[in-house]
């Protein structure tokens, strides 16, 4: 009894000390040290004091007026909670478990103190009635944040059912939707060092999770789901952003599981399960004659189940720019339509799109260890531009058959590249290439290879280099000696076929075809 009384008195004394020092940050630092020293002698008090000390960084939305019944509008309470948490380092804005909070569209804006977390353990629901929706294309927007975490074991539900029913109709056998007013569920803009993990996102009126102009983002363990026929309900969309790492996500929606738009680079996707949906899409790129750039996308270990597309690159006619250094490997297709698809004639118009000569250049695309079943006869479709052909297309150990077990087909148009290992079905325009090991080495920077094809120069003084965008020149070299074998450096910023289409003899600055 005496020991318990003494412990209680000691704890009360500590509380008084904490209150007295609360206004002095330097005193607080010294106090923390004193508390730690004292608590080493009493473990039970240490646990209690630390629980209260840590609780000071948690901002529970209920404490700021939010009502967890799913009916009362908690928008203002969420905004107030954010404003308080934003000012404190390592703060946690908590949406508690076993509660449902109704929130209208809201912007959570920074900059904030570092290590801020928005932790959703309960459920957040949107306004389900389009007629009552406030004028905004985004439901929950996060902007101008650094070192920010959006996480939790809870659910963010866009309640998009009424939006889908009222905004779409079938025209000439195609579903056409009015997307002008349908909101995106979550958008993160102009932010760095962001982590999004473990949440369940569902039933967004339109896209579920969109990133714009972000850098250094990790997405892990998300579950994103919407009905197969829900229109334009992309899982994750990335625009004008770089350095993304996406892993261990399960996505099934009515549109792209993951879409990568222009201005994006260094995107890694690992251990993805996709389906239903439209697969992983790069694009669409080059719409309305615009310039587009996407580079260094790596997909490793993915499974596509009953998807409308698998690995898709889509560009509009009339655009310009470059999509390059794209690698897909270790992918399984299960009854997926269009498992491998490059479509440079992408068109969503109800009528046919006009043919145009310019196009986004597609270079250096690798498909490695892709296997499974296709729901469409053409398991591989490489439909490249007539005026700007695809170059550096590389297929290694690809085996796809129809779900019925019958052979599938490959349709390739203006696709230049090679295959190695197994290729089922065969593609008529691809030629045999290097071994898988050589194939891997080619992708590395400053790789040196022996080559003596396709160029010539005067006498023995020969300098050969690769040209990333040489003009069309069909004149063969005349009156010159064949070039001696040279060491060719394959640069990562100049994607080429293993046997490049054109060479430069720099001693007299002429370009030749092999």
Swiss-Prot record:
GO terms for molecular function: polygalacturonase activity. Residues 23-50 form a propeptide. Belongs to the glycosyl hydrolase 28 family. InterPro entries: Glyco_hydro_28 (IPR000743), PbH1 (IPR006626), Pectin_lyas_fold (IPR012334), Pectin_lyase_fold/virulence (IPR011050). PbH1 repeats lie at residues 214-240, 241-262, 264-284, 294-315, 323-344, 357-384. Its EC number is 3.2.1.15. It comes from Chamaecyparis obtusa (Hinoki false-cypress). It comes from the Eukaryota. GO terms for biological process: carbohydrate metabolic process; cell wall organization; fruit ripening. Residues 1-22 form the signal peptide. Glycans are attached at residues 266, 397. Its main location: secreted. The keyword Cell wall biogenesis/degradation applies. It is found in: Secreted; Secreted, Cell wall. Gene3D superfamilies: Single-stranded right-handed beta-helix, Pectin lyase-like. SUPFAM superfamilies: Pectin lyase-like (SSF51126). This is Polygalacturonase.
């Amino acid at each position: 009894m005496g020991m318990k009384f003494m412990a209680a008195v000691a704890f009360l004394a500590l509380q008084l000390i904490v209150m007295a020092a609360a206004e002095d940050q330097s005193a607080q630092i010294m106090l923390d040290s004193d508390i730690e020293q004292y608590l080493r002698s009493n473990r039970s008090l240490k646990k209690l004091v630390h629980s209260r000390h840590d609780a000071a960084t948690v901002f529970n939305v209920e404490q700021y007026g939010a009502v967890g019944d799913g009916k009362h509008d908690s928008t203002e309470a969420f905004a107030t909670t954010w404003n308080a948490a934003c000012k404190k380092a390592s703060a946690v804005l908590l949406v508690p478990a076993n509660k449902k909070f109704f929130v209208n569209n809201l912007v959570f804006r920074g900059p904030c103190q570092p290590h801020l977390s928005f932790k959703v353990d309960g459920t957040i629901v949107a306004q389900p009635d389009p007629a009552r929706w406030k004028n905004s294309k985004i439901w929950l927007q996060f902007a101008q944040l650094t070192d920010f975490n959006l996480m939790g074991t809870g659910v963010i539900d866009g309640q998009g059912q009424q939006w889908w029913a009222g905004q779409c109709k079938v025209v000439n056998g195609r579903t056409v939707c009015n997307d002008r007013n349908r909101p995106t569920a979550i958008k993160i803009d102009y932010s760095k060092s962001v982590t999004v993990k473990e949440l369940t996102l569902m039933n967004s009126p339109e896209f579920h999770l969109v990133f714009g102009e972000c850098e250094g983002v990790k997405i892990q363990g998300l579950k994103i789901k919407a009905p197969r026929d829900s229109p334009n309900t992309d899982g994750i969309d990335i625009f004008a952003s770089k350095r993304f790492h996406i892993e261990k996500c399960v996505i099934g929606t009515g549109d792209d599981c993951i879409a990568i738009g222009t201005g994006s680079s260094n995107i890694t996707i690992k251990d993805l399960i996709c389906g239903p949906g439209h697969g992983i899409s790069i694009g669409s790129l080059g719409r309305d004659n615009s310039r587009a750039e996407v580079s260094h996308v790596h997909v490793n270990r993915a499974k596509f189940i009953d998807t409308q597309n698998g690995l898709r690159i889509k560009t509009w006619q009339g655009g310009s720019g470059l999509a390059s250094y794209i690698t897909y490997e270790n992918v399984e297709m299960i009854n997926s339509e269009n498992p491998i698809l490059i479509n440079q004639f992408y068109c969503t118009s109800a009528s046919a799109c006009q043919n145009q000569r310019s196009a986004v250049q597609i270079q250096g695309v690798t498909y490695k260890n892709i296997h499974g079943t296709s729901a469409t006869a053409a398991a591989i479709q490489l439909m490249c531009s007539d005026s700007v052909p695809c170059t550096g297309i590389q297929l290694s150990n690809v085996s796809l058959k129809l779900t019925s077990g019958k052979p599938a087909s490959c349709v390739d148009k203006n696709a230049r590249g090679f295959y190695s290992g197994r290729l089922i079905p065969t593609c008529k325009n691809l030629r045999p290439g290097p071994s898988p090991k050589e194939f891997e080495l080619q992708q590395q920077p400053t790789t040196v290879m022996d080559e003596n094809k396709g160029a010539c120069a005067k006498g023995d003084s020969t300098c050969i280099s690769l040209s990333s965008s040489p003009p069309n020149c069909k004149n063969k070299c005349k009156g010159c000696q064949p070039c001696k074998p040279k060491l060719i450096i394959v640069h990562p910023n100049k994607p080429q076929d293993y046997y490049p289409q054109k060479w430069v003899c720099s001693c007299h600055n002429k370009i030749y075809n092999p």
